[in-house]
Amino acid sequence: MPRHKKIAVFFILLLATGLIGMNIYDNQQKKKQEAQEQRQTTTLEKTAIDRTEGDKERANDFTLKTTSGETIRLSDYRGKKVILNFWATWCPPCKAEMPHMQAFHEKHKNDVEIIAVNLTSLDNGNDALEKFIKDYRLTFTIPLDQEGTIGNRYKAYTIPTSYVIDEEGYIQHKVIGPMNEEMMEDMVTSNG
């Protein structure tokens, strides 16, 4: 075999070995990262849920200021069902969900409270928020999570994330992703 063919075969084998090695290394790194994320998720102590009374899960109380400057506490809404929603103005699924949420609010504002927590720490500023509220004609309560602590506590890592909370403050449902009006109707009428 001529010398230049031997060199070509050598480089092809070297390249193939390198590609196989890189693929194995990438797979190992992905597995390590997934394992680390799983450990982090399971070691989170402070969550949205205070476990009491068997398998009922009480929603963790919080205090936030609304867009109008009013201070609200989640526990102030005991005695009424609550849809607790986490969202941001730049989020396309949140944008799709808001007209449904507003329509639901207009029909059920006496029976169900919508608290749509804006993840302000991740959002595009107050001007964008004010424009969004005006454009979508939102009239339900919108508190501001300036630090991101409430969103983290409720594990709103994917938005929108919503919780349906019963009159006694217990979580009935958690929904990751957008809801339509029919889904909201179904969830507030079911008992968990």
Regions found by a protein language model. Name each.
Residues E130-E168:
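Short, internal strand/loop/helix patches
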Residues I83-L84, I114:
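Hydrophobic beta-strand anchors of alpha/beta hydrolase catalytic cores
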Residues M1-R58:
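N-terminal targeting signals for export/organelle localization
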Residues V112-N126, T139-E147:
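Thiol-based oxidoreductase modules, predominantly thioredoxin-like and allied folds used
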Residues A96, A103-N110, K134-R137, T141, ...:
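Sec-exported extracytoplasmic/periplasmic mature domains
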Residues R78, F86-E106:
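Conserved redox-active cysteine motifs that mediate thiol-disulfide chemistry
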Residues E53-K56, D61-V82, E106:
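A short beta-strand-turn-helix
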Residues G18, A35-T42, D166-G192:
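Thiol-/selenol-based redox modules, centered on thioredoxin-like
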